[in-house]
Amino acid sequence: MSAVKKALDLMKAEEVEYVDIRFCDPRGKLQHVTLIADLVDEDFFEEGFMFDGSSIAGWKSIDQSDMKLIPDASSVYIDPFYAEKTMCVHCNVVEPDTAEAYSRDPRIALKAEAYLKASGIGDVAYFGPEAEFFIFDDVRYSVTPAKVAYQIDAEAAAWNTDAEVEMGNLAHRAGHKGGYFPVNPVDEAQDLRGEMLSTMKRMGMKVDKHHHEVATCQHELGLIFGGLTEQADNILKYKYVIHNVAHAYGKTVTFMPKPMKGDNGSGMHVNMSIWKDGKPLFAGDKYADLSQEALYFIGGILKHAKALNALTNPGTNSYKRLIPGFEAPVLRAYSARNRSGCVRIPWTESPKAKRVEARFPDPSANPYLAFAALLMAGLDGIKNKIDPGPASDKDLYDLPPEELAAIPTVCGSLREALTELEKDHDFLLAGDVFTKDQ
């Protein structure tokens, strides 16, 4: 049965009233327009929907504003929050006169997957992102000619041990950097995260766990690995669910990498593997039971890490996180199990689970662009046999200053990242996956 037929059958079975067509803007934000379900038939999935591209930041000028959304029928799901039964579908953006993919559509991740197959290196790339976030009770900000400020607060925050609370301060709080894995009542968000995970499961997402993270008010939910574009779609759904469930509880969520000074920031560690002919390409007999191809893949990521920062760490706040300490992976080194380098090989007994984890990305990244860029860097490493050098199995932050100074780092600012991308972007242009217009 075709994807379109399945989508139309879902509409009928669920008695759908509306269809929400969604797409991703250059910043990684989900956008949408809602249509009466009566307008959606088989032709709609082929003909698409026209919209004003000049109203999306970074896209068209007003004199060339017409653009078209083409729904991807394989991406449909029922929205869990709308009052009226609504089916959602993610879209690709195309030029209306040529029907060609729009060069600035973040869903170029599809082209990266096609490039992998065409290269002969592998058939499929699997991605497992781990996006952390903070939950607060109160967030205030002000940007005026006289003041620029923001303020955050949460009853569960470590700084509220002496706060006056209406029903009494029960003192069940994790201390500074003490948030990792405590049970309730210290972990006060257990049920909130559980509802988030259950909602994702009802939407058809593959999930596996949830827990409190190290920093005060910091959390993480687990996505089971999937294809590159599928997981980029899932990160958008992940954020959508987390924001909306928290909102229903009277709380607010931020995926900002470093919302407060002096505590751990939020990363989006990205686990990656490549399979070919039904077999894991990264399993072998080299360091940490990796294959030579996996080591070359790591070499590509380490070589291009500074250019990648422009896409995996795209905001000024990203570089408040990428500083020594706070478990931040600023050093361009790799290791098995060692979390102080920017690439880690998680321990596993199963060859099928052998993977590479890039630790420097953060959840402010556009997932389509970040995942596609990471894959392109790794494939460049395999194609050009880029040696990653020896692994670093020590705690790199405990090295003597002279040894630490010899280890290269990721970028320290967005300005540096953009400069590095300008100098090093040819690997992204291979197969026309990215364009200079991107």
Curated annotation (Swiss-Prot):
Activity regulation description: The activity of this enzyme could be controlled by adenylation under conditions of abundant glutamine.
Q: What's the protein called, per UniProt?
A: Glutamine synthetase
Top-level taxon of the source organism: Bacteria
Q: What is the lineage of its organism?
A: Bacteria, Pseudomonadati, Pseudomonadota, Alphaproteobacteria, Rhodobacterales
Q: Which residues carry this modification: O-AMP-tyrosine?
A: Y397
Cross-referenced PROSITE patterns: GLNA_1, GLNA_ATP, GS_BETA_GRASP, GS_CATALYTIC
Q: Name one GO cellular component term.
A: cytoplasm
- Organism (species): Rhodobacter capsulatus (Rhodopseudomonas capsulata)
Ligand binding (ATP): D208, N271, M272, S273, R339, R344, K352
A GO term (biological process) for this protein?
glutamine biosynthetic process
Matching InterPro entries: Gln_synt_N, Gln_synt_N_sf, Gln_synth/guanido_kin_cat_dom, Gln_synth_cat_dom, Gln_synth_gly_rich_site, Gln_synth_I, Gln_synth_N_conserv_site
Transmembrane intervals: none
Q: How many and how are cofactors bound here?
A: Binds 2 Mg(2+) ions per subunit.
Coiled coil region boundaries: none
Gene name in the database record = glnA
* Sequence positions that bind Mg(2+) 1: E130, H269, E357
